[in-house]
Amino acid sequence: MTNIRKTHPLMKIINHSFIDLPTPSNISSWWNFGSLLGLCLMIQIVTGLFLAMHYTSDTTTAFSSVAHICRDVNYGWLIRYMHANGASMFFICLFLHVGRGVYYGSYTFMETWNIGVILLFAMMATAFMGYVLPWGQMSFWGATVITNLLSAIPYIGTSLVEWIWGGFXVDKATLTRFFAFHFILPFIITALVIIHLLFLHETGSNNPTGLNSDADKIPFHPYYTVKDLLGALVLILFLMTLVLFFPDLLGDPDNYTPANPLNTPPHIKPEWYFLFAYAILRSIPNKLGGVLALILSILVLAFLPLLHTSKQRSLMFRPITQTLYWMLVANLLILTWVGGQPVEHPFTTIGQLASISYFSIILILMPISGMIEDKLLKWSL
């Protein structure tokens, strides 16, 4: 009798995706982050669902309902902090996953990569709206500042902002719709993830060498299921350490003060995972220019396949571009640090220099170094 997993219509899909999937034999731990992102998404949906059962999306009771979850609901504090810190773990895995894709040239899988960029935007939107829900000071002012950026759009800007707000200020209507969107987006993300995997399985996985691995494939199960399980255990260890010992490490103390439209916090800043983009936004003195730079800082990923000049796919054997890549990583860390600093000298200058070098490395230096390496290997035509 044939195994049910190979005949049953539903089991067959699962079998071809997670069990009998032919996988390159040499993929390293950098390939673990896809499954870890899936785990993060599941944790976020489950904890978010339980939080939604007790949360009220009304300006008068939102802050109190979060306090109620932490104080009165059974293990509410655990669910709340798992959700808040789970978002941080999600973005850590996300940045490492994207970084791996850039390093090993995975962006040459155009469809998979573009869905990935859309996923990144969807996750950033979800995280931003989730940050508004506790209705603390930073929630309110973060929502005000970021939504206000849309007013930079010529002609329709002001109307667009008021339409998103549902009034003339961030108020009850804004909070209610943000809660609705924050609830629905993770399910849209889940659908996009399935499409992401569908496109990936059309081509098969990339590997560290960037070479064709058809000659050396192994089944996904048990080799990579066990490897992913180890990664999952490490992720849960990190997450629970954060939740149980340092729950407020990555949060903002201002968010423990209820939202007050009459009192602006001295330093408005987003969550740590948006600081690099926030620094790029702030480094341009023009409002519209800043907004465009902010969008482009993420959208630039979509242009990577067009900027690939080398005849080699991966950076494994390309020392010049490798150096530029790690300069880019250092640059992003500097931008993250600057984004959390006040708008004053020398931080503004550092932010501007880091923003210029960020775009220069990606758009100019990396394509040039790819051509130089081809020339050095006498590979150029």
From Swiss-Prot:
Q: Which GO terms describe its cellular component?
A: mitochondrial inner membrane; respiratory chain complex III
Name the UniProt key words of this record, in alphabetical order: Electron transport, Heme, Iron, Membrane, Metal-binding, Mitochondrion, Mitochondrion inner membrane, Respiratory chain, Transmembrane, Transmembrane helix, Transport, Ubiquinone
Superkingdom field: Eukaryota
Name a GO molecular-function annotation: metal ion binding
Question: Mainly localized where?
Answer: mitochondrion
The residues the record assigns to binding a ubiquinone are 201
Q: How is the cofactor bound?
A: Binds 2 heme b groups non-covalently.
Specify which residues bind heme b b562 according to the UniProt entry for this protein: 83, 182
Tell me where it resides.
Mitochondrion inner membrane
* Obligatory cofactor(s): heme b
InterPro entries hit by this protein: Cyt_b/b6_C, Cyt_b/b6_C_sf, Cyt_b/b6_N, Cytb/b6-like_sf, Cytochrome_b, Cytochrome_b_C_euk/bac, Cytochrome_b_N_euk/bac, Di-haem_cyt_TM
- The record lists heme b b566 as bound by 97, 196
Q: How does it sit in the membrane?
A: Multi-pass membrane protein
Q: What are the GO BP annotations of this UniProt entry? A: mitochondrial electron transport, ubiquinol to cytochrome c
The residue stretches assigned to a coiled coil in this entry are: none
Membrane spanning residue stretches: 33-53, 77-98, 113-133, 178-198, 226-246, 288-308, 320-340, 347-367
Record's miscellaneous remark: Heme 1 (or BL or b562) is low-potential and absorbs at about 562 nm, and heme 2 (or BH or b566) is high-potential and absorbs at about 566 nm.
Which family would the database say this protein is a member of? Belongs to the cytochrome b family.
Tell me which PANTHER family the record gives: CYTOCHROME B
Q: How does it assemble?
A: The cytochrome bc1 complex contains 11 subunits: 3 respiratory subunits (MT-CYB, CYC1 and UQCRFS1), 2 core proteins (UQCRC1 and UQCRC2) and 6 low-molecular weight proteins (UQCRH/QCR6, UQCRB/QCR7, UQCRQ/QCR8, UQCR10/QCR9, UQCR11/QCR10 and a cleavage product of UQCRFS1). This cytochrome bc1 complex then forms a dimer.
Job description of the protein? Component of the ubiquinol-cytochrome c reductase complex (complex III or cytochrome b-c1 complex) that is part of the mitochondrial respiratory chain. The b-c1 complex mediates electron transfer from ubiquinol to cytochrome c. Contributes to the generation of a proton gradient across the mitochondrial membrane that is then used for ATP synthesis.
Q: Any idea what this protein is called?
A: Cytochrome b
Q: Which organism is it from?
A: Apomys gracilirostris (Large mindoro forest mouse)
